Amino acid sequence: MPRRRRNTVSRIWSSALNAIDIECPARLHLGFIDPGASSGRRFGSLGLALDGLGTHLRVQRVRTAREAYFAAGERAGAERERALACLARLRRAFDFDAPLAIELLDAIPPHAGLGSGTQLSLALGYAVARLAGRDAAQRRIAQHTERGARSGIGIGVFEQGGFVVDGGRAEQTAVPPIVARHPFPAAWRVLLVFDAMHAGLSGEAEASAFRALPPFPARDTERIAALTLMHVLPALAEVDFERFGPAVTEIQARVGDHFAPAQGGRYASPRVARWLDWFAARGAACHGQSSWGPTGFVMTASAEEARILIEAAKAARAADDPVRFRIVAGRNAGARIVESRDGAPMHAS
């Protein structure tokens, strides 16, 4: 009998419920398997949850007639309008009008290819659903918040963390199902390459780009599927970075070249592209772009290898180069959720 996949969302709660605190991870989207549906299912995605970079919010009932919103930090403040728009959709979906305070303590950089919108929507959706006494299943919330139309990766990392693969969409699919999940090796690292001067495609611009692209070649789908099943996933199971890295890089090249007409090249940001070429010339075997970018990544087999690369890059970077670097690990757990109702509802000022 197949073993049931473990949901690694961590929840802590008390017997009564008044407030919910959620911290959920950013993710890399490592490419589509079949955006042209030549296999009979469309899209199919590979992704990885990231540790040390995520969205953290707290939602609490308040004694006030109007909504209260609190934000801490530049990234969190920039997400105010998106959070309130998402809340409005959730209120309609759940027919729930109790006043709430939202404190956004940290946020994934928006429009950077790291899943900021999906994680914010899932976290806020879970909190509102629980406070409203409604179904808090992530796939239901994704539908209410108009997430997961093309990829189930964001939902997968919210629920489980780790390295996940979704099975794409059939005609009746609401949200693409997660069909494989492996823990990301603890020793491996991800060096992120940020370009704050460039924004990846999203919303209607993203939808228009998909419509304008030519059909995805069936031979590329066949190759990416083979790389995923026979290289990437076995390499994770066997902690074999030498097999894993080149397979991910090849997937990235095939997908990036297909999307090049929409994003201006294999990578969206010319600055990030130059740095990825720079890392590759120094032996980095695993590199690419997350989603529509502009964030690029280099994966390494150890923290020391990542440290050597980032120190060399910082030494070579010009003073006026806006590109920044950061080393993170993979995250093998989903969202951390604390539910509580200790004392009376807070008063919002």
Language-model segment annotations:
Residues 50-52, 280, 288-292, 319:
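A structural signal for short secondary-structure junctions
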Residues 114-116, 120, 220-222, 285-291:
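Short glycine/threonine-rich catalytic loop with a Thr-x-Gly-x-Asp
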Residues 4, 9-112, 126-138, 149, ...:
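ATP-binding N-lobe of GHMP and related small-molecule kinases
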Residues 265, 290-297:
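Small/polar glycine-rich anion-binding or flexible loop at a beta-alpha turn
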Residues 11-23, 31-33, 38-45, 137-285, ...:
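ATP-dependent small-molecule kinase catalytic core of the GHMP/sugar-kinase superfamily
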Residues 61-63, 224-226, 288-290:
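Short, flexible turn/loop "capping" segments at secondary-structure junctions
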Residues 114-138, 157-168:
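DPxDG-like acidic metal-binding loop motif
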